[in-house]
Amino acid sequence: MDEQTYALATKAAWYYYMEDNTQAQIAEVMGVSRAKVIRLLEEARAQGIVQFSFRKNDSQRVSAEQLLIDRFGLKDAFVVPTPLDSSAINQSIAQGAAHYVSDHLREDGYLNIGYGDTVSRMLGFLAKNREESLNVVSLTGGVSYYLPSVGTTAYSMHLFLTPSPLVVSSRQVRDALLDEKSLQDVSTMTEYADMSVVGIGAAVEGATVLRNGILNEGELTVLKMQGAVGDVLNHFMDKDGNLIQTEIEDRVISTDLDKLRQLKNVVG
């Protein structure tokens, strides 16, 4: 049993044995079929997860997930183990995200993806390990940021990418591009996708936006002085989640945050 399946089996067992939920209720909460819940409960017993007590690490993981759900009003949460090498954290999260998406995305479903290092890595894992072909729709411009993660496995994916840069030279250029039918068609597709996965970037030294040359250090410093703590889809926000209106915001070709909130099953 791989680590991700082990985590799902642990979660299902917690809901069933510790919180006394029915299998149907667990299926609804976890977004899987009842048959899948039954298999996970069987795996939990077979692997010794359920022994009329919970192993400390397993209990801590599910408790952490439930705390996140309760604190932020989430539909679900998935906690992955912290790797021994801290530099591999994005890789670990990407693997967990790929497993989560694969478990919850129907065979012929459409997946929206946003810009970010972890999302890019996740897409690579999905492309290599998912048996069914993928239908992928981009939530931002910047084709060059999506294709490298797919590599030679692109043949197994149907890619619908926004044909534009992520950041352009002026607001006028952005507005002109957004009027193009090719961009509008992709934007419309995002509204009907089954799931969306976006990266949550931090406004820190070594941020993806710096490594990829989207912003320079001076621009990021100005954003931080204005209260920026991170970004989603290259929209920078303060600690309370409020959008920071800047000149850079006027040049970004990206799904706006109000629209993102309306999409189905957003995973960050």
Language-model segments: what does each one mean?
Residues 3-13, 17-25, 31, 36-42, ...:
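Conserved phosphate- and dinucleotide-binding cores of soluble alpha/beta proteins
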